[in-house]
Design a protein with these regions (language model features):
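Non-catalytic C-terminal accessory modules of carbohydrate-active enzymes
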Residues: 9-147, 151, 157-183
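Generic helix N-cap/helix-start motif at coil->alpha-helix transitions
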Residues: 2-4, 41
């Protein structure tokens, strides 16, 4: 059969290699009740990822173990940490998206270490991978040591290439984070 759990691994690797469009194509192949896997054939609930799909004649496309799988967790990680690029880091959230080229915008809200982060990622040039230029609460994140104002840069120099680090504020507030993918 087709083991779906590993699909999440492939999505993450596609994103690590800068292939956001491929990552989305892979995710769509195993989405519940999608064109490739209609619930009428698979027998799975239309809102639940399955562990695997059968390739045996007579059972082709039937799903197994839809409620006992890590597939949903790994695919969520592929979407959230891979495509949207929102990753936990020791110093805060690192946001380095790998978008499907067709995506112009995506947003998410993340609770992290005592604060909420409303994150909007914009991709007007339809890049799969670009340099994230980040603002937090209206202030541009620039290079410098991690705790300089207000964000750090993995390269720690004075360029505008924000290495994607948004600090962990831990203040109980909601912070507005805007990410612009640039060349």
């Amino acid at each position: 059969g087709v083991y779906c759990h590993a699909t999440g691994f492939k999505i993450l690797m596609d994103c690590k290699c800068g292939r956001g469009t491929k990552a989305l194509e892979t995710l769509k192949k195993i989405m519940p009740d999608s064109g490739k896997n209609p619930s009428s054939r698979s027998g799975a609930e239309p809102y639940v990822f399955t562990n695997c799909y059968s390739t045996n004649p007579g059972y082709y496309g039937k799903s197994y173990q839809s409620w006992t799988t890590g597939t949903s967790a790994w695919c969520m990680m592929g979407l959230y940490e891979g495509m949207m690029g929102i990753k936990r880091d020791y110093d805060g959230l690192r946001i380095v998206p790998c978008f499907p080229a067709a995506w112009e915008e995506a947003e998410a809200t993340r609770h992290f270490r005592g604060a909420d982060y409303h994150i909007v990622i914009r991709n007007p040039k339809h890049l799969e991978k670009g340099k994230p230029v980040i603002t937090v609460d209206g202030s541009l994140c620039v290079g410098g040591p991690v705790n300089s104002s207000p964000c750090g840069d993995e390269r720690r120099d004075d360029s505008l290439y924000a290495g994607g680090l948004v600090p962990a504020f831990g203040d109980g507030k909601t912070h507005e984070v805007e990410v612009l993918l640039s060349e």
